[in-house]
Amino acid sequence: MKMNVLQTLKERGFIEQTTHDQELEDLLSGEQVSCYIGFDPTASSLHVGSLVPIMSLAHMQRAGHRPIALVGGGTGLVGDPSGKTEMRKLLTLEDVNNNAEGIRAQLARFIDFDKGAVQENNANWLVGLKYIEFLRDFGRHFSVNRMIKAESYRMRLESEEGLSFIEFNYMLLQAYDFLHLFNEYGCQLQMGGSDQWGNIVAGIDLIRRAKGGSAYGITFPLITTSAGIKMGKTHKGAVWLDPERTSPYEYFQFWVNTHDDDVPRFLALFTFLPMEQINKVKDLDGAELNLAKTILAFEATTLAHGRDQAVGALEAAYNMFGAREIPADLLADSSIPREGAAKAEDSVPTTVMEQARLQEGVPAFELFDEIGLCASRGAARRLLGQGGGYVNNERIDSFDYKISLVDMKDNEIILRAGKKNYHRLVLSEK
């Protein structure tokens, strides 16, 4: 018997709370259901923290339902106070539209808009709203007493910053979005982060009061690592889905560096691999668990950037850190290349250097020439000037940059010239 998509989402760790749980399960067991999630266009790119809602829409589509990805081009002009301790900077319409374009392109990598999925921008119906008519027709359905009890408002009302009137309107606008999509697409389900519970319930109530219709909500848990760090954050900031902000290789390495305790959970959330295979990963450790991390990285990078980029990132990792043969029975449904993986270079060329020399620092152009990454110091200068020199996969942006002990990570420094020429520096034992 095919599993209901609600059961799938629960099993894989997507769900924190639902409204009318049994009714919702019955609804999703029947005919096609239209469901939506809103995406806030405060930046031109989504990041890894947005993957839970994106993947949930993809699961809905795979189960035969119709996902609606709503870019908040209209609500983005107001700003959502949910989960914020101070008022967001208001964006211009031009900023919001530009950001919305970038977000739509990224969503298309996960959701097939040629097979029934819908992309919408709420600016299409919110920007032209007439204020008096909106208050008369819909404002009467909202209780201020109930609104200020919502967690999203209560936290702001208790803060020193307070809650602006423009933000107070946000709940009404999001509720109206749900009503509009209910009218236009028969949309009965809204999903969102745990901080959206009050806004989702407001939309459900508006549909019931204004149309006498039934609607439902699902919220997702806040995903943190086992160390308690918010998902998608690193010491360098957010991990973006835009390859211009976070390269496919950096994206791949983000997943490779997953903490051991998080691997099964992240495989369930961020890949489509079967749970019966993922559950076996819980018993792995050491080298076998590291191979599971490689598969997680490959699958996640394939979804975000395509298979070619994932293969390129995998090969770069093999060339840099050494190849590992991946057993056929480890997460067997993964599309990761298994044959030939062990034929990659065992390691990159390595130079042993004395600590005292790196303590002082060596000019990058000098070192690139010395270890053979460039044919001469002049060639090395040209390479650096063109942005083709890297230390630990970070572009060297200055002619004067010196390679030093500060660059040492895990007892080594990885230098790169261009896309594929790597060299490792390690310290002598003296």
From Swiss-Prot:
It catalyses: tRNA(Tyr) + L-tyrosine + ATP = L-tyrosyl-tRNA(Tyr) + AMP + diphosphate + H(+). GO terms for biological process: tyrosyl-tRNA aminoacylation. The keyword Ligase applies. Keywords: Aminoacyl-tRNA synthetase, ATP-binding, Cytoplasm, Ligase, Nucleotide-binding, Protein biosynthesis, RNA-binding. Its EC number is 6.1.1.1. A motif ('HIGH' region) lies at residues 41-50. The keyword Ribonucleoprotein does not apply. Gene3D superfamilies: HUPs, RNA-binding S4 domain, Tyrosyl-Transfer RNA Synthetase. L-tyrosine binds at residues 36, 170, 174. A motif ('KMSKS' region) lies at residues 230-234. InterPro entries: aa-tRNA-synth_Ic, Rossmann-like_a/b/a_fold, S4_RNA-bd_sf, SYY-like_C, Tyr-tRNA-ligase, Tyr-tRNA-ligase_bac-type, Tyr-tRNA-ligase_bac_1. GO terms for cellular component: cytosol. SUPFAM superfamilies: Alpha-L RNA-binding motif, Nucleotidylyl transferase. It is an enzyme of class 6 (ligase). NCBIfam families: tyrS (TIGR00234). Catalyzes the attachment of tyrosine to tRNA(Tyr) in a two-step reaction: tyrosine is first activated by ATP to form Tyr-AMP and then transferred to the acceptor end of tRNA(Tyr). Homodimer. Belongs to the class-I aminoacyl-tRNA synthetase family. TyrS type 1 subfamily. This is Tyrosine--tRNA ligase. It comes from Desulfatibacillum aliphaticivorans.
